[in-house]
Amino acid sequence: MQILADLLNTIPAIDPAAMSRAQRHIDGLLKPVGSLGKLEALAIQLAGMPGLNGIPHVGKKAILVMCADHGVWEEGVAISPKEVTAIQAENMTRGTTGVCVLAAQAGANVHVIDVGIDTAEPIPGLINMRVARGSGNIASAPAMSRRQAEKLLLDVICYTRELAKNGVTLFGVGELGMANTTPAAAIVSTITGWDPEEVVGIGANLPTDKLANKIDVVRRAITLNQPNPQDGVDVLAKVGGFDLVGIAGVMLGAASCGLPVLLDGFLSYAAALAACQMSPAIKPYLIPSHLSAEKGARIALSHLGLEPYLNMDMRLGEGSGAALAMPIIEAACAIYNNMGELAASNIVLPGNTTSDLNS
């Protein structure tokens, strides 16, 4: 799809000059150089994002939760009934799920998006981008056609860009779908080259005696569909799912506006791997929130070159980790914008040669 290809080619590069200015500013603040550690690095990363105009700040916050069912559920890779996807999506509209509670605490709006829930009628209160009533069973067929994947990517990119126009400067991603750690593991295995046995985990409390079947399902899906690890769209279409495509679309859409995206857990790592294959330029816009407790998490993050800020033993999904990390982003912005300067207090620290001290 040419429109998608054109958009991927217009993702702006990070501004190194803005990052250098931010580094000098931070080194001149009322503290020993580097003493705020990762907060300083995060503020500098944000300063380099063109959509923030060189000044780390947070405007409106949005978490986009992609909801979809998966045909591979039929292979016995999840213990929850498939209907739980629709039930939990409805609960999200009431604000009672984990991500909704944490997002409210963080001051973020949750956008619950139906990209493939298996119900006869659309669920009231959800944003309807449904492609089909669940993806194909990747153990016996592709998850979807390439055309379906590209259209959904473009739809979500456009939705994300519209939110940015309306003042959202910080995005988070989340998902909801029974059995969705199976296609996520297939994506991670395909792109990283690691064997499914090293990547597949228990998801939502799958009994350990059923894990061998889940590993076999992932291996069969990859063998049957032969996804091209160099082609992110191909991987998503063949062994992914509509929720994973949607998450990738948020990342691409936010990056196209020069804005940050907070990853969530294992599903978001898988989507990020595919999205980075489509456009490596998006990687500096991705901020890892927490280390998922899912087995393949470290493998995926290592391949992405990302180190998460939190380790809370969480594996809920939904965008819960992204919501939990939003205050960290705001803290990085706060130190940048609100701390005093060494020079104003006539403090000179050994080894500090920043321009701030000489101004």
From Swiss-Prot:
| Keyword Nucleotidyltransferase set for record | no
Q: Does the keyword Glycosyltransferase apply?
A: yes
Which CDD domains is this protein grouped with? DMB-PRT_CobT
> Which Gene3D superfamilies does this one have?
1.10.1610.10, 3.40.50.10210
Q: Which GO terms describe its molecular function?
A: nicotinate-nucleotide-dimethylbenzimidazole phosphoribosyltransferase activity
Stored InterPro entries:
Nict_dMeBzImd_PRibTrfase, Nict_dMeBzImd_PRibTrfase_bact, Nict_dMeBzImd_PRibTrfase_N, Nict_dMeBzImd_PRibTrfase_sf
Q: Which reaction does it catalyse?
A: 5,6-dimethylbenzimidazole + nicotinate beta-D-ribonucleotide = alpha-ribazole 5'-phosphate + nicotinate + H(+)
One of the GO biological process terms: cobalamin biosynthetic process
Which superkingdom, per the lineage?
Bacteria
What are its E.C. numbers?
2.4.2.21
Q: Where is the active site?
A: E318 (proton acceptor)
Tell me which UniProt keywords the record has, alphabetically: Cobalamin biosynthesis, Glycosyltransferase, Transferase
Pathway it works in: Nucleoside biosynthesis; alpha-ribazole biosynthesis; alpha-ribazole from 5,6-dimethylbenzimidazole: step 1/2
Pfam families listed in its UniProt record: DBI_PRT (PF02277)
* Reported function: Catalyzes the synthesis of alpha-ribazole-5'-phosphate from nicotinate mononucleotide (NAMN) and 5,6-dimethylbenzimidazole (DMB).
Task: Write down the PANTHER family for this protein, in alphabetical order.
Answer: NICOTINATE-NUCLEOTIDE--DIMETHYLBENZIMIDAZOLE PHOSPHORIBOSYLTRANSFERASE
Tell me its family.
Belongs to the CobT family.
Q: How does it assemble?
A: Homodimer.
Q: What is this protein called?
A: Nicotinate-nucleotide--dimethylbenzimidazole phosphoribosyltransferase
